[in-house]
Amino acid sequence: MNSKYLFVFLILNVIFIDLCQGFLFNVIPHAINATASLIKKGTRRRELGSQYDYLQDFRKRELDLDDLLSKFPDY
């Protein structure tokens, strides 16, 4: 009778250890990766803000070039 309970106890321990191992080696790294991607998104937003000024200057130069080319006569 005692061996039956011991066997059930061992099976339950194996199942519990497997669940814990799945949690430690699956959920925790995904949480770390999610945190890292959130940090990267924050820096990306700042980079896009600095690129906006560059793109605005580029559009202004493009409009100036179009204005300059429109003054040339057509051949």
Curated annotation (Swiss-Prot):
Signal found in the keyword field: yes
Principal place of residence: secreted
Tissue: Expressed by the venom gland.
Signal peptide extent: 1-22
Disulphide connectivity of cysteines: none
Keyword flag Transcription: no
Cellular component, GO annotation: extracellular region
Residues making up the propeptide: 42-75
Modified residues (Lysine amide): 41
Location(s) in or outside the cell: Secreted
Keyword terms, alphabetized: Amidation, Antimicrobial, Antiviral protein, Secreted, Signal
Superkingdom to which the source organism belongs: Eukaryota
One GO biological process term: regulation of defense response to virus
Recorded family membership: Belongs to the non-disulfide-bridged peptide (NDBP) superfamily. Short antimicrobial peptide (group 4) family.
Note: Shows a low ability to inhibit hepatitis C virus (HCV) infection in Huh7.5.1 cells.
Record's protein name: Peptide Ctri9610
Source taxonomy: Eukaryota, Metazoa, Ecdysozoa, Arthropoda, Chelicerata
